[in-house]
Amino acid sequence: MELRLCLRLHAPPASAPTTHPPPPLSPSPNLALRRLRTGGSCAVAPRRHARKWGSAVCAAKADGAQGEAVKERSVSVVLLSGGQGKRMGASMPKQYLPLLGLPIALHSLKTFCQLKEVKEVVVVCDPDYKDIFEGSIENVQIPIKFALPGKERQDSVYNGLQEIDGDSELVCVHDSARPLVSSEDVKKVLEDAIVHGAAVLGVPVKATIKEADSNSFVVKTLDRKTLWEMQTPQVMRPSLLRDGFELVKRDGLEVTDDVSIVEYLKHSVYITEGSYTNIKVTTPDDLLLAERLMNEK
């Protein structure tokens, strides 16, 4: 399973609260400290993360302050569903395999369609699989659009970005192979993206991570207290993503996730602490785990 890690650093406590609201793209000084991702490492940003080690979920706890409210019908979702899923060893891409009677990709589509903040969903998929999405969710109040997948992930995101409404305040990119993302976590990361311009769901790393040299000898053991595993959704202002794509294309860069595109602009990316249950279904074992987690809900 692809692992995206982020270093986080410690910073001095935040200053005393101010009576004036913060500007949209700057960390708010009147919130408790929260970790902020900046160019591959994390400074400190506002909202405290508290870990619940006794359960599968590592939830973010707010100290009475949250991100700004997200307007109704102001978010465009780009649902990436064009992968081949070769590691699953199935006859079809993994995102279309059944999970409790429903194709994996439709679980997250259903979650997004039920959120009042979402105005549309752009599904990036092979045209042969469009019929899986069309008419799949009852009483859908928002349009479902389609875009063609690209050779690489960043190409698929770019194609999806071209189809979103021009008035959208946020674009929310999600892997359809993550069927267990909760509406609560989606709302949290949307709120944080409104405040900071870009935000991503992530969870603190549990395993010990070692850095190795080219000969596979250990160089050092990294402090797991400073490491995060990235998830999706990854949310940002459309203008940031477009500007990032221009830079990526100009410099011939390759990126492994969506917020990396924004990082190339030297723009801070906020980490919203998510849930360990938001797994990516990549292997047969992942599918079994997803079934068990869904049955426990």
Swiss-Prot record:
> Which Pfam families would you find in this protein's record?
IspD
Q: Where is the transit peptide?
A: 1-57
Superkingdom of origin organism: Eukaryota
Annotated Gene Ontology cellular components are: chloroplast stroma
Keyword tRNA processing listed? The answer is no
List all membrane-crossing ranges.
Answer: none
- Specify whether Cell cycle is a keyword of the entry: no
Q: What is its main location?
A: plastid
Name the coenzymes or cofactors required.
a divalent metal cation
- Per the record, where is site Positions MEP for the nucleophilic attack? 224, 280
Q: What is this protein called?
A: 2-C-methyl-D-erythritol 4-phosphate cytidylyltransferase, chloroplastic
